[in-house]
Structure formats: C-alpha cells, structure tokens
C-alpha cells in the first residue's frame, strides 16, 4: 500500500520517453489489438495502434463518440489492452481532466503508487473542433493536470455520413454542402486552424503539435514528446 502524501503529484513529469529512431526500433508489444470492426484500410485504427504503442502500458485512453467508439467496443469485447472509457461527443477534454484529477487524488491519499500514468483523450473534429471545443479549452487552463488531447481530423462528421464540420475545408462537397445549380461551391467557410487557436489562446499549454500518420514514426515521437513534457 502506498503512503499518503501532501505533496503535489505530477503524473507525467518524472518520465522520459526517448524518441524512436526508426521503424525497426519500435516495440513489439501491442496495446490496441486485432478484433476491432473498423472498415478495411481505416486510418483511425492505425492512429489508435500507433498512439498507444508510443505511450506504453501505463496509459488510460478516453474516447468520445465516433467510429473508434462503435468499432472498438463490441458487446463484451474490445481491442484495447489498456484501460479505455467512452465519453460523450463533446466531453473528451473534461473527461480527461477528471481522470487526471482522480489519479492525482488517489496517489495523494496513498491508494495508488505515485508513478506517471498517461491520460490520453481522443476525439474527432466534430467532438474537438466543434462540440468539444469549450471542454478542451477549459482543460488547457489547468496546467497542474497532465492530459494529452488528440484530435483526429476527418474534416467532416465521418461517423454519420460525412456532414459538414468546423474543420471542413473551403469548397468541400459534403452531405450538408452538395453542389447546386445556382451555386456550385456551397461550403464557403474556411477551415478552423485548431493548432494555432489552441496555442495562442492557452499560454499555459505546454505542447501543441500537428502530425500526419503517413509519417508514423514522427507522429509517435510527437506523442512521446508531449507525454514527456507533461
């Protein structure tokens, strides 16, 4: 049993996750395994696999409603090896903050060993750039809790038949912006610049980055860098 402590507990600061030097240096252990029901060739499943492989086994993942909720939580089964929790569509940030605060409280009371445990909250652009933006913004104003928020940018509400989102680029054809006879370009709003907006508006946020899974090692190293910074 761990002993209670009145000291401030920083969950992630003590760990140092070195960057991977290449594909051949990646660990063999998998924490997001086969058996999920994503579509063939789905990149979101690859993102989940690489994200949690980079983070390691001492990780809690929280995911908002979307494809990665529907496809990975078949009744009585899951592809997640690490603890995973579903959150409502707009609450990934607040759920991640609550998980980090709960871990910190349990460690302070001596009910958990004081060690770095990664808390990663995952959402799509609908749950991040639109409905979940306020929760993410509120989470980033609490620098004493360490939460990594990862937004997968589909540039649409992809789980519900490609509707328009705040991350949809100008001129895109979606089910909410089909081309018409009078106006061929129906979507005339510009895509939100989420990275710049979060970085500029939250000076206590310690890390903001953008990645592309075509460069998977670089993406995994960005996850490790964020978790090391805390």
What are the functions of these language-model segments?
Residues 1-117:
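Thiamine diphosphate
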């Amino acid at each position: 049993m761990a002993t209670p402590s009145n000291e401030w507990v920083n969950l992630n600061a003590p760990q140092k996750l070195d960057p991977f030097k290449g594909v051949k240096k990646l660990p063999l252990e998998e924490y997001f395994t086969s058996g999920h029901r994503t579509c063939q060739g789905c990149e979101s499943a690859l993102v989940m696999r690489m994200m949690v492989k980079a983070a390691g086994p001492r990780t809690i993942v929280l995911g908002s409603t979307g494809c990665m909720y529907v496809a990975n939580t078949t009744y009585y089964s899951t592809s997640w090896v690490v603890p995973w929790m579903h959150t409502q569509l707009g609450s990934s940030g607040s759920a991640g903050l609550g998980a980090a605060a709960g871990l910190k409280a349990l460690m302070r009371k001596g009910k958990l060993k004081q060690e770095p445990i990664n808390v990663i909250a995952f959402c799509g652009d609908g749950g991040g750039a639109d409905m979940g933006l306020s929760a993410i913004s509120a989470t980033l104003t609490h620098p004493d809790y360490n939460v990594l928020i990862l937004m997968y940018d589909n540039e649409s509400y992809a789980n519900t038949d490609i509707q328009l989102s705040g991350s949809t680029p100008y001129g895109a054809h979606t089910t909410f912006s089909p081309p018409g006879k009078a106006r061929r370009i129906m979507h005339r709003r510009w895509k939100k610049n989420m990275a710049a907006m979060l970085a500029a508006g939250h000076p206590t946020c310690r890390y903001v980055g953008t990645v592309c899974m075509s460069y998977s090692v670089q993406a995994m190293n960005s996850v490790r860098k964020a978790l090391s910074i805390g």
